[in-house]
Curated annotation (Swiss-Prot):
<dbReference type="GO" id="GO:0030139">
    <property type="term" value="C:endocytic vesicle"/>
</dbReference>
<feature type="lipid moiety-binding region" description="GPI-anchor amidated glycine">
    <location>
        <position position="448"/>
    </location>
</feature>
<keyword id="KW-0325">Glycoprotein</keyword>
<comment type="function">
    <text>Catalyzes hyaluronan degradation into small fragments that are endocytosed and degraded in lysosomes by HYAL1 and exoglycosidases. Essential for the breakdown of extracellular matrix hyaluronan.</text>
</comment>
<keyword id="KW-0336">GPI-anchor</keyword>
<keyword id="KW-0378">Hydrolase</keyword>
<dbReference type="GO" id="GO:0051216">
    <property type="term" value="P:cartilage development"/>
</dbReference>
<dbReference type="GO" id="GO:0009897">
    <property type="term" value="C:external side of plasma membrane"/>
</dbReference>
<dbReference type="GO" id="GO:0009615">
    <property type="term" value="P:response to virus"/>
</dbReference>
<dbReference type="GO" id="GO:0045944">
    <property type="term" value="P:positive regulation of transcription by RNA polymerase II"/>
</dbReference>
<feature type="active site" description="Proton donor">
    <location>
        <position position="135"/>
    </location>
</feature>
<dbReference type="GO" id="GO:0005764">
    <property type="term" value="C:lysosome"/>
</dbReference>
<feature type="propeptide" description="Removed in mature form">
    <location>
        <begin position="449"/>
        <end position="473"/>
    </location>
</feature>
<feature type="disulfide bond">
    <location>
        <begin position="365"/>
        <end position="376"/>
    </location>
</feature>
<dbReference type="GO" id="GO:0019899">
    <property type="term" value="F:enzyme binding"/>
</dbReference>
<dbReference type="GO" id="GO:0005783">
    <property type="term" value="C:endoplasmic reticulum"/>
</dbReference>
<dbReference type="GO" id="GO:0030294">
    <property type="term" value="F:receptor signaling protein tyrosine kinase inhibitor activity"/>
</dbReference>
């Protein structure tokens, strides 16, 4: 009898199969065609006209504002009072729309959904991102801790009022069932309805999935950033939500405690990795696009992220294979001339140069490695390798003529650049394309005919290497 494969071979095979499964095709870019989008969703519209501090935001693929008065934007955030009849308790402890999902009329909720969606997204034809930001309660019962325990208490009271003779453990079990069932129905009905009304938008819930890896405060010395196993399992309980979503919107807001530390990168990396795991696990033939919410400053402070933390947030998200990042901010960014001037200086000095670098590096990798039909994904998620323009090959130069971008990269591809990309990154193809370099076009295949070949990878590399590649916006 022949000996079977050794443990090393078996492990390698398992890892290879696992990694191949991870790289399901995903949705193509919906805005500029870039594989990695950087969006500015900060209410800075008053800096120029009101406070006389104009901001140059042309480096961002999308510019939007989360403020109430803005409609028909490429990114629309539906806060709790902007979409349907979201049940909750207000800050005074008063019940709103029944308090818990068990008390909501889905019929009345759907009726209000249509009115609000049509107000904020006024045409069916436009494509964009639609983010539902409901944070008062969580659909998994056990996650409603601390101030969210009010939703469990009311759920228990509802059951106890109907069954006063039941023992406490039975009341808790029934309350959990009723709450989770109603929460699931409420969220699913919401997604199904809004997708039908605005089908060209990508819909999902903000902060889903979460990783619950905030234990750096208690365990700084031993902090790894990993998502607790129990929270990964609880995310899998939400398979019904991932199956109905068309995009995922995790959050990686950095507390100043994590500033310029390895823990900051670990915090972000595992949150994004968990979102990407969920994105590829719950759909048979494709992976959901992941758009990562971050802030240009640290949480609760108007202090711009350091260069190290821009790499740990924007750079890490790009290298892991996210579809983009959304830089979000609130009204605190534009309270005075001083805050606007601080943002202007920070944009010019650090943020815009880094955004331009990463935006073009991801596009460059997509063209060189994936024929422009996919995005580059780090082979080893834990590696310290990023999609940055090589300083030996490219430089950023300012635009001078009217209408020119603030910065543009100029340079040419080198063999060292090609080798670096091939060694550290591989392709995740867009839907309709396959192959190691996304060279097979399935969109043109019909009736068993062989797929169209998008071109030899080696030929494209030789051509790129031969060209003096000048990047212009």
């Amino acid at each position: 009898m022949r000996a079977g494969p050794g443990p090393t071979v078996t492990l390698a095979l398992v890892l290879a199969v696992s990694w191949a499964m991870e790289l399901k095709p995903t949705a193509p870019p919906i805005f500029t065609g870039r594989p990695f989008v950087v969006a500015w969703d900060v209410p800075t519209q008053d800096c120029g006209p009101r406070l006389k501090v104009p901001l140059d935001l042309n480096a961002f693929d999308v510019q939007a504002s989360p403020n109430e008065g803005f409609v028909n934007q490429n990114i629309t955030i539906f806060y709790r009072d902007r979409l349907g009849l979201y049940p909750r308790f207000d800050s005074a402890g008063r019940s709103v729309h029944g308090g818990v999902p068990q008390n909501v009329s889905l019929w009345a909720h759907r009726k209000m959904l249509q009115k609000r969606v049509e107000h904020y997204i006024r045409t069916q034809e436009s494509a964009g991102l639609a983010v539902i930001d409901w944070e008062d309660w969580r659909p998994v019962w056990v996650r409603n801790w601390q101030d969210k325990d009010v939703y469990r208490r009311l759920s228990r009271q509802l059951v106890a009022s109907r069954h006063p003779d039941w023992p406490p453990d039975r009341i808790v079990k029934q309350a959990q069932y009723e709450f989770e069932f109603a929460a699931q129905q409420f969220m699913l009905e919401t997604l199904r309805y809004v997708k039908a009304v605005r089908p060209r938008h990508l819909w999902g819930f903000y902060l889903f999935p979460d990783c619950y890896n905030h234990d750096y405060v208690q365990n700084w010395e031993s902090y790894t950033g990993r998502c607790p196993d129990v929270e990964v399992a609880r995310n899998d309980q939400l398979a019904w939500l991932w199956a109905e979503s068309t995009a995922l919107f995790p959050s990686v807001y950095l507390d100043e405690t994590l500033a310029s530390s390895r823990h900051g990168r670990n915090f972000v990396s595992f949150r994004v990795q968990e979102a990407l795991r969920v994105a590829r696990t719950h759909h048979a033939n494709h992976a959901l696009p992941v758009y990562v919410f971050t802030r240009p400053t640290y949480s609760r402070r108007l202090t711009g992220l350091s260069e190290m933390d821009l790499i740990s947030t924007i750079g890490e998200s790009a290298a892991l294979g996210a579809a983009g990042v959304i830089l979000w901010g609130d009204a605190g960014y534009t309270t005075s001339t001083e805050t606007c001037q601080y943002l202007k200086d920070y944009l010019t000095r650090l943020l815009v140069p880094y955004v331009v670098n990463v935006s073009w590096a991801t596009q460059y990798c997509s063209r060189a490695q994936c024929h422009g039909h996919g995005r580059c994904v780090r082979r080893n998620p834990s590696a310290s390798t990023f999609l940055h323009l090589s300083t030996n090959s490219f430089r950023l130069v300012p635009g001078h003529a009217p209408g020119e971008p603030q910065l543009r990269p100029v340079g040419e591809l080198s063999w060292a650049d090609i080798d670096h990309l091939q060694t550290h990154f591989r392709c995740q193809c867009y839907l309709g394309w396959s192959g190691e370099q996304c060279q097979w076009d399935h969109r043109q295949a019909a009736g068993g005919a062989s797929e169209a070949w998008a071109g030899s990878h080696l030929t494209s590399l030789l051509a790129l290497a031969a060209l003096a590649f000048t990047w212009t916006l």
